[in-house]
């Protein structure tokens, strides 16, 4: 397990609400909560920025974190991430915020403390461009969207 430095920005974390944790031993993501002052209503088509009450510092340039949606929020309520995926670089130290977009047809009330997203650590490989005149030919070649078929 990798150590992740965190600062609690909202004093309710650790008292009223637990620190982010893995739901099961096999979980890939740490659940992040909506650390709001009061419940908010997100109207259809509306996007709001919600604080998690934490800041993190990964520190290791071989790692980054992704903020991903929780599947139940999108499937049951139409609440997805406004930017689809949040990328947290290893040298970022600011507050974690979650952009929530209501893509549904009805208003959604986001309760204080609701688990709204998950934080997943991922390996990072930085690359440099090697400029070439031609690529080595492959079976796929330049075939784009849908080129590999559906079956």
UniProtKB/Swiss-Prot annotation:
- Cofactor(s) it depends on: Mg(2+)
Part of which pathway?
Pyrimidine metabolism; dUMP biosynthesis; dUMP from dCTP (dUTP route): step 2/2
Q: Could you confirm whether the keyword Transmembrane helix appears in this record?
A: no
- List residues binding substrate: 70-72, 83, 87-89, 97
Q: What is its EC number?
A: 3.6.1.23
GO molecular function, one example? dUTP diphosphatase activity
**One Gene Ontology term from the biological process aspect of the record:** dUTP catabolic process
Enzymatic reactions: dUTP + H2O = dUMP + diphosphate + H(+)
Which keywords annotate this record?
Hydrolase, Magnesium, Metal-binding, Nucleotide metabolism
Highest rank taxon of the organism: Bacteria
Keyword Hydrolase belongs to the record: yes
Q: Which family does it belong to?
A: Belongs to the dUTPase family.
Q: What does this protein do?
A: This enzyme is involved in nucleotide metabolism: it produces dUMP, the immediate precursor of thymidine nucleotides and it decreases the intracellular concentration of dUTP so that uracil cannot be incorporated into DNA.
* Name recorded for this polypeptide: Deoxyuridine 5'-triphosphate nucleotidohydrolase
């Amino acid at each position: 397990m990798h150590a992740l430095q965190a600062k609690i920005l909202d004093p309710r974390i650790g008292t009223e609400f637990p620190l982010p944790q893995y739901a099961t031993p096999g979980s890939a993501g740490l659940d992040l909560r909506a650390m709001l002052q009061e419940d908010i209503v997100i109207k259809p088509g509306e996007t709001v920025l919600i604080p998690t009450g934490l800041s993190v510092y990964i520190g290791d340039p071989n790692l980054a974190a992704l903020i991903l949606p929780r599947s139940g929020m999108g499937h049951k309520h139409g609440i997805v991430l406004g930017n689809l995926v949040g990328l947290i670089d290893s040298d970022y130290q600011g507050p974690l915020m979650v952009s929530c977009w209501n893509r549904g047809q009805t208003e959604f009330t986001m309760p204080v403390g609701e688990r709204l997203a998950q934080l997943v650590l991922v390996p990072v490989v930085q690359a440099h461009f090697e400029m070439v005149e031609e690529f080595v030919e492959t079976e796929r070649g330049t075939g784009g969207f849908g080129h590999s078929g559906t079956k």
